[in-house]
C-alpha cells in the first residue's frame, strides 16, 4: 500500500489515537483532514502537524450528526480532491455503570458517536472512495473490548458499541471484496489517551459537558497505557500489510482464547443435548 501523496480523513483527530494516527500519516507523506468535535484541540493538532511537509485541513464536526458529516466530506473533497483513507476513530465512554441505570440520552450519545459515527463515515465517504478507483483503506477503531467484556471495568455499554464495530468492519470487508479499498478494525488495549474525559465532549443536545464520576482514577489508569504514537505506527504497518484485525498488545490473546473456549463449550453442550445427554 502506497501512502505518500494520498489523503486521509481522520475522525477523533484532535488527540489520543486519532492524533497518533495523524502523526504516522504525516511522517509517511499523507495529506490529512482532521475531524473532531473539539475546535480548540483541533487547531492545536493541526498546528503541530504543520511541521511536517504535508497539507492539513481541520473540520469541527459531531460525527453522530449525519448531515454534518456530509458537509464535512464535501468540504474535505473541495480542499483535497480524492480521499483515499478513512479512519473512523472518534469514540466516547461512560465508564462503569450498570446497563439498567443508563438514561435514553446516555444510550443516544454513546451509540451515536461510537456506532452511528462510524456508519456515517462509511455511508458518506466509502462511495466516494470507490468511485475514483484508487487504492485506499477504511480503518474502524473498535477496542479489545469489542472482543470480550472486561469483568473488572464493567463498561458494558462501551463494549456493546465496540462489538458492533467489529461486526460492522467484518461486513464492510466482505462488501469491499474485489475493490481497490480494504477494510480493517483496530482493537487496542490500554492506550494513554483522554478517553476518560469523554464527558467534556458531550454535545448540548444530549445534555452538554459534565463531570464523569471516577474520571480521575480512569486517567491515572490510562496514563500507564501505550502511547498514541506507537498505536499510529502500528496501524499504518498493519494497513500496509493488508491486515484485518489490528492489535496493539499481546497480553489480551489469553482473554480472547478463554472467551472462545466458553463459546466452544456451548457447542459441546448442544452436541451432548442432541445426543440424548439431557439433564432434565
Model-derived segments and spans:
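Conserved glycine-rich Rossmann-like NAD(P)H-binding loop of the short-chain dehydrogenase/reductase
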Residues: 28-44
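SDR active-site lid
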Residues: 178-246
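Substrate-binding pocket helix/loop in short-chain dehydrogenase/reductase
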Residues: 97-99, 106-108
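Active-site helix of classical SDR
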Residues: 122, 161
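Canonical Rossmann dinucleotide-binding motif of NAD(H)/NADP(H)-dependent dehydrogenases/reductases
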Residues: 2-33
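Residue(s) in the substrate-gating loop at a strand-loop-helix junction
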Residues: 143
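The beta1-alpha1 cofactor-binding region of Rossmann-like NAD(H)/NADP(H)-dependent oxidoreductases
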Residues: 39-40, 59-71, 104
